[in-house]
């Protein structure tokens, strides 16, 4: 009996999702039993035994090892599924579990699609999350609610996998909204911190704007095609002409909100108020790439209108340049990495704009490894420096934290050095932009942003390792914890090997007919950026710090100030208008100030008729009778 490869892939992936869903219910902090305790629990160093007043024996343990074991097994299963797909050249597998609503004008079914996009992303997401979960066991060891934290991380991953494997708009929206809700819970994990709560609220409100776009796309698709199946909607491309601008607007708005494009970007740096593992997971392989992944899934809609390509290209290039220029002026190490994420998301959107969705997805996969590693390295450094995050106070980390410092250098070089993960995908995107005949402005913005990427990447290396430490706090943590080292080394392996592996075994990189100068652009641009950094460091003086360019980049192009000022100005203008037109205008004249004059005038009219003349009484009576007769005749006729 020969087993079909499609059946193997479907079974493995459904099993992965089912096990991941079932594992959520086992993240419990304690178990209770009468008498002897014979539960087959995972033994950890944090396990303890206590007896309460009812003589119930309670075992409390940290569920971190259980979460790591589950994700480890699922990661190996996902890699096995990916290898089966590669060996059999399977394009996609569509699975319909059930028709949820079948007797309605809109048929809603639970559809899953297992294609190359999902299978590659599944392996990357599970490996990265496994590493982050292992790091969390080291980082959150003193948190009393660590079991709930592991549960939320797992649910968050599950929502992202539902989003990426769904072929139904209903399930896509479920994963989309689930990721947003879980991000609120994770960012505000330390609920006693006002900054964490306000940052979580900012992220939710900003994502609501993006949700308007996704709901617009879903509503128009449902009304015109009576189907929630994404493949059916995309295959009806010839019937989309009247609706295409509105559908594209919805998709671009949704992606801009979820992937923090320029204009809706301030929520992404706000994620840093949560624990470092949350920042690593959100910035690498889950929530922030959901918008770009949605554009990759629906890239067929972007094939015809060139103006849409230009708009997306300019949006991505502006985002990349804005974030890169802001990152070079930051001093908080986590903020530099956060703005680096925004810049790389802009580069992914640029790839969509030039009609290369496969390159955007390629960059998603390579970016996940080194970005997660950079955040974990920053968390290790911050722990070791007693919560110090200022880049200027660091230095000499190579002797104090050899593993962390090596991984931090590797992650910083991944965006600019050849033969590392980020360079493979970024090289192809820049080469594709050079060969593009679309908007020149977006292409120039992307190239300048890439040069600035080398600046802030090398700036991290320079301040952390070339200088002597100026932090007075003692180094209270070391690298003896194997959970920290294992997580970093696993991600370092992915940073080194993923670019070559994906480009040679999974993706077929397109070839572009470009000049030798354009071919060497990905190598020339980082060198120019590093040279500019050294020149600025050599010639920098205390008087040059107050320059206009430095003020603009430090203040994020004054975007936040402009938005806040516009909101305040608009509120004051509306208040002034309300005060003049309502409180001190017609409402005041009609209401409080108008009742007395109106009553006086009516009283005078009434008094004028009460002067004691009989002829006036008879005249008013006759007039009343005539009016009544006229109304009666009018009604009867």
Swiss-Prot record:
It catalyses: a ubiquinone + NADH + 5 H(+)(in) = a ubiquinol + NAD(+) + 4 H(+)(out). GO terms for molecular function: NADH dehydrogenase (ubiquinone) activity. InterPro entries: NADH_DH_su5_C (IPR010934), NADHpl_OxRdtase_5_subgr (IPR018393), ND/Mrp_TM (IPR001750), NU5C-like (IPR003945), Proton_antipo_N (IPR001516). It holds the Pfam family NADH5_C. Its main location: mitochondrion. GO terms for cellular component: mitochondrial inner membrane; respiratory chain complex I. It is found in: Mitochondrion inner membrane. It is a multi-pass membrane protein. The chain crosses the membrane at residues 7-27, 64-84, 117-137, 146-166, 169-189, 203-223, 240-260, 276-296, 309-329, 345-365, 403-423, 435-455, 492-512, 520-540, 557-577, 617-637. It is an enzyme of class 7 (translocase). One of its GO terms (biological process) is ATP synthesis coupled electron transport. Keywords: Electron transport, Membrane, Mitochondrion, Mitochondrion inner membrane, NAD, Respiratory chain, Translocase, Transmembrane, Transmembrane helix, Transport, Ubiquinone. Its EC number is 7.1.1.2. Belongs to the complex I subunit 5 family. Core subunit of the mitochondrial membrane respiratory chain NADH dehydrogenase (Complex I) that is believed to belong to the minimal assembly required for catalysis. Complex I functions in the transfer of electrons from NADH to the respiratory chain. The immediate electron acceptor for the enzyme is believed to be ubiquinone. PANTHER family: NADH-UBIQUINONE OXIDOREDUCTASE CHAIN 5. This is NADH-ubiquinone oxidoreductase chain 5. It comes from Strongylocentrotus purpuratus. The lineage of its organism: Eukaryota, Metazoa, Echinodermata, Eleutherozoa, Echinozoa.
């Amino acid at each position: 009996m020969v087993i079909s490869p499609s059946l193997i892939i479907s079974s493995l992936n459904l099993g992965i999702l089912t096990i991941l869903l079932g594992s959520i219910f086992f993240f419990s902090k304690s178990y209770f039993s009468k008498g002897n305790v014979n539960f087959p629990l995972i033994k950890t160093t944090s396990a303890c035994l206590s007896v309460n007043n009812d003589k119930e024996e309670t075992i409390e343990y940290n569920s971190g090892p259980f979460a790591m074991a589950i994700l480890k097994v699922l990661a190996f299963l996902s890699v096995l599924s990916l290898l089966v797909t590669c060996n059999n050249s399977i394009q996609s597998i569509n699975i319909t579990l059930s028709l949820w609503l079948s007797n309605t004008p809109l048929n809603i079914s639970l559809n899953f699609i297992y294609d190359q996009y999902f299978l590659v992303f599944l392996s990357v997401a599970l490996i990265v999350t496994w590493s982050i979960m292992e790091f969390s066991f080291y980082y959150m060891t003193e948190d009393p609610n660590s079991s709930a934290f592991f549960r939320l991380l797992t649910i968050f991953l599950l929502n992202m996998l539902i989003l990426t494997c769904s072929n139904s708009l209903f399930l896509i929206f479920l994963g989309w909204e689930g990721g947003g809700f879980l991000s609120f819970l994770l960012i505000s994990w330390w609920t006693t911190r006002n900054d964490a709560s306000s940052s979580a609220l900012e992220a939710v409100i900003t994502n609501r704007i993006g949700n308007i776009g996704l709901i617009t796309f879903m509503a128009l698709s449902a009304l015109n095609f009576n189907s929630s199946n994404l493949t059916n909607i995309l295959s009806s491309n010839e019937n989309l002409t009247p609706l295409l601008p509105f559908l594209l607007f919805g998709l671009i708005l949704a992606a801009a909100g979820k992937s923090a494009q320029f204009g809706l970007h301030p929520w992404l740096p706000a994620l840093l108020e949560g624990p470092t593992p949350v920042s690593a997971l959100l910035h690498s392989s889950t929530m922030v790439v959901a918008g770009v992944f949605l554009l990759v899934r629906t890239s067929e809609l972007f094939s015809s209108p060139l103006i849409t390509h230009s708009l997306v290209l300019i949006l991505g290039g502006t985002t990349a340049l804005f974030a890169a220029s802001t990152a070079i002026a930051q001093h908080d190490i986590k903020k530099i990495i956060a703005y680096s994420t925004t810049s790389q998301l802009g580069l992914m959107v640029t790839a969509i704009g030039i009609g290369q969705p496969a390159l955007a997805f390629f960059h998603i996969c390579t970016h996940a490894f080194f970005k997660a590693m950079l955040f974990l390295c920053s968390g290790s450094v911050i722990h070791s420096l007693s919560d110090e995050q200022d880049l200027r106070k660091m230095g000499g980390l190579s002797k104090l934290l050899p593993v962390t410092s090596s991984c931090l250098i590797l992650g910083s070089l991944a965006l600019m050095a050849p033969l590392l993960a980020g360079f493979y995908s970024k090289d192809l995107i820049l080469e594709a932009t050079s060969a593009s005949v679309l908007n020149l402005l977006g292409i120039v913005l992307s190239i300048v942003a890439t040069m600035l990427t080398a600046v802030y990447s090398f700036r991290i290396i320079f301040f952390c390792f070339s200088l002597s430490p100026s932090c007075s706090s003692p180094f209270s943590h070391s690298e003896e914890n194997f959970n920290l080292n294992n997580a970093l080394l696993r991600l370092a392996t992915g940073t080194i090997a993923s670019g070559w592996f994906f480009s040679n075994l999974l993706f077929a990189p397109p070839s572009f007919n470009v000049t030798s100068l354009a071919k060497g652009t990905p190598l020339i641009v980082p060198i120019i950026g590093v040279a500019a950094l050294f020149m600025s460091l050599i010639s920098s003086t205390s008087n040059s710090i107050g320059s206009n360019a430095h003020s603009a980049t430090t203040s994020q192009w004054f975007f936040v100030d402009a938005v806040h000022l516009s909101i305040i100005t608009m509120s004051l203008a509306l208040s002034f208008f309300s005060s003049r037109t309502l409180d001190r205008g017609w409402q005041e004249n009609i209401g409080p100030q108008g009742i007395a004059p109106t009553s006086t005038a009516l009283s005078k009219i009434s008094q004028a008729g009460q002067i004691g003349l009989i002829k006036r009484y008879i005249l008013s009576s006759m007039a009343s009778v005539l009016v009544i007769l006229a109304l009666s005749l009018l009604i009867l006729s």
